[in-house]
Structures are given as structure tokens and as C-alpha cells.
Amino acid sequence: MTKQVEIFTDGSCLGNPGPGGYGVVLRYKQVEKTLAQGYRLTTNNRMEMMATIVALQALKEPCNVILTTDSQYVRQGITQWIHNWKKRGWKTADKKPVKNADLWQALDKETTRHTIDWRWVKGHAGHRENEMCDELARAAAENPTLDDTGYQPAE
């Protein structure tokens, strides 16, 4: 029987771009696990995406996932926009390269392993797990240890 897992994610950036971090809460039955990491220079959207990728990668087998994010960018990107991006060879409707294509491709790969119900929650609205993720992400952003090698400054 496929495991039912709940995932909550958030990304944070101190400046955009700037130091950033992600926070994740994974829940299986009554057990919760948290993940967080900070990056020296990145963007908020990249951290929101990184949170979902890392969370899905942490699952050792295919699962039924309820994934809750406060990022419409992530939720709409993976459920709506990505289909046309892939058809166009990772280009937008106006023929420009898709921003954060490295992470969209990684997220797309992870989503094929699982059955995912993508949910959105308003950030900073008292949602327990979202607040936990926000605190984890902020703390990670305040103490960044990694380089976001895929980050490309806007021109």
C-alpha cells in the first residue's frame, strides 16, 4: 500500500536576491521531520522551489503526497505552466528562456515518482506548519552555508 505523506514547504530570502533558505516539514502518520538549508545568494522563488524538490527527494519510495506551499509560483508553475514550457523546449510564450529552468526540471523529475495533491495556503496567516517552515527558512537564510550554483543574476 502506498504511504500517505504530508509535506509543507516555505522559502525565504533576505533581500531578493540575497541570502536565502528553505524550510520543510514532512509528516508520515504522527512523525514529523524538518529540513532546512541556507544559501549565500539566491532568490525567494528559487528557495520556494528548492524546498519542494528537497522534500520530495527525501521520500525513499513513491508516495501519495499532499504538498502544501504558500507559493503560487510553485503551485501554478508545476500544475499549469510547466506543460507548455516543456512543449516549447523550456521557453516562455514570448520565446524567452524559462527562469529557474534547472529547478523546474528537477521538480518535474521528482513529481513523476509520486502522486501529488498540490495545495496552497496563505503565508503568515497562522497556519501551524507554514509558520514552522517560515521559521526554519528564515533561520537558514540568516546562516547560509551553501552556494546556489544554478542562480543566475538578472541582466
Swiss-Prot record:
Alphabetic keyword roster: Cytoplasm, Endonuclease, Hydrolase, Magnesium, Metal-binding, Nuclease
Q: Which residues bind Mg(2+) 2?
A: 10, 134
* SUPFAM superfamilies xref list: Ribonuclease H-like
Principal localization reads cytoplasm
Keyword Hydrolase assigned to the entry: answer is yes
Query: Known Pfam families for this protein?
Result: RNase_H
| Classification via CDD domains | RNase_HI_prokaryote_like
Q: Where in the cell is it found?
A: Cytoplasm
List S-S links within the chain.
none
The answer on whether this UniProt entry bears the keyword Protein transport reads no
Q: Which family does it belong to?
A: Belongs to the RNase H family.
The protein's job, in short, is: Endonuclease that specifically degrades the RNA of RNA-DNA hybrids.
Record HAMAP family: RNase_H (MF_00042)
- Protein name, as recorded: Ribonuclease H
The species is Vibrio vulnificus (strain YJ016)
Gene it is expressed from = rnhA
